[in-house]
UniProtKB/Swiss-Prot annotation:
Homodimer. Forms a homodimer with a parallel, head-to-head assembly of the monomers. Under conditions of potassium starvation and corresponding low c-di-AMP levels, apo-DarB specifically interacts with the N-terminal region of the RelA. Under the same conditions, apo-DarB also specifically interacts with the C-terminal part of the pyruvate carboxylase. It comes from Bacillus subtilis (strain 168). This is Cyclic di-AMP receptor B. It comes from the Bacteria. The gene is darB. The keyword Membrane does not apply. Residues 18-78 form the CBS domain. Involved in the c-di-AMP-dependent regulation of the bacterial stringent response. Modulates the activities of at least two enzymes under conditions of potassium limitation. Apo-DarB regulates the activity of the GTP pyrophosphokinase RelA by interacting directly with RelA, leading to stimulation of (p)ppGpp synthesis and induction of the stringent response. SUPFAM superfamilies: CBS-domain pair. No conformational changes occur upon c-di-AMP binding. 3',3'-c-di-AMP binds at K23, A25, T46, A47, R131.
């Protein structure tokens, strides 16, 4: 069992460690699946946030969701990519964090998710809280305790 002798990290908020919205790839609800697949492929991500024009978070879209929506009985129906919108396929029941949530809440949520979307009081997308950032900060914290 690791003993964290300092409460400094544990008192932090999600907003202090998130990747800000302007650095996060996303699509809008009205975009077609072809555009979403292009963004996912170009960035190398498997899932990205879906926002409306006011930057409100509506859900996530991922490569698997897109591919499942174009599977036909005998072939992949690529021609459907420009006919189906992101909002028809996206996952809406997603974990969310508030920008002022304690970091411990975020720690628990990234156990089962590579990232969790962060929003403010008006459900406006503020960024993502990633497992990578959590592990990086935890590593830095543990190293500082061992000095």
């Amino acid at each position: 069992m690791i003993s964290l002798q300092s409460d400094q990290l544990l008192e932090a908020t999600v907003g202090q460690f998130m990747i800000e919205a302007d650095k996060v790839a996303h699509v809008q609800v009205g975009n077609n699946l072809e555009h979403a697949l292009l963004v996912l492929t170009k960035t190398g991500y498997t899932a990205i946030p879906v926002l409306d024009p006011s930057y409100r978070l509506h859900g996530l879209i991922g490569t698997n969701m897109i591919m499942n929506s174009i599977f036909g009985l005998e072939r992949i129906e690529f021609e459907k990519l420009d006919q189906i919108t992101v909002e028809e396929v996206m996952l809406t029941d997603i974990p969310r964090l508030h920008i002022n949530d304690p970091i411990m809440k975020g720690f628990g949520m990234v156990i089962n998710n590579g990232f969790v979307c962060v929003e403010n009081d008006e459900q406006v997308f503020e960024g993502i809280f990633t497992r990578r950032v959590v592990l990086k900060e935890l590593n830095k914290h543990i190293r500082s305790l061992n000095k």
